[in-house]
Amino acid sequence: MTITQNIQVSKARVMDEVAKATAYIGQKAVSQQDPDAYERIATTDANREELDRYWMEACTAASLLLDHWLTDQTSQVLSHHPELGTAHDYKVTLGMPTNWNFAYLTSVNEALMSYLVNSIVTKWLLRTQKQDAAAYAALVEDAARQITQLMLVRKRPPRRSSGSSDDGELWGGPQLWGGPQLWGH
């Protein structure tokens, strides 16, 4: 039995984080040898079309990462309407087992946010500042590993205590099977 769970990551929030990260990297890279590093590395509205393409690629990669848990309905929407990724938030519906620990939903959302941001930053840096791209690619791998680990967490089945009121419920209770006194104890 599965329970559907919706996950949504705001494209505007991701792009804001991408802008902050690239501005920081650009500011850090400014030197006498490279005084124009900030203008080259920091993203602007002029880069929107390219960043939208990176957004779609990151969303596709995230969907592949979550493929095992995507509902059939979600997979159809993603495969038949890829243009949704350029203008809208990243939204997926997951089919989770009932024993999945739903307390980790916020952590999955945040790891997915990190995955999307760092995927876009990595692609951008491969174009503008290759020496920093490897560090962000490692962050993408870490986020992917974290998402997978969080998706695989299951709650332990509850244990019945020996003094619980449902002792023997499976066999009709102690009154039907005689209880310990019939076993010679």
Question: What are these language model-derived features?
Answer:
Residues Q129-L139:
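Short conserved catalytic/interaction loops centered on acidic-Pro-aromatic/His motifs
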Residues T60, A111-R127:
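Short, hydrophobic/amphipathic alpha-helical patches that form generic packing surfaces
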Residues M1-L105, L139-E141, R145-H185:
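Conserved short "hinge" loops at termini or chain/domain junctions
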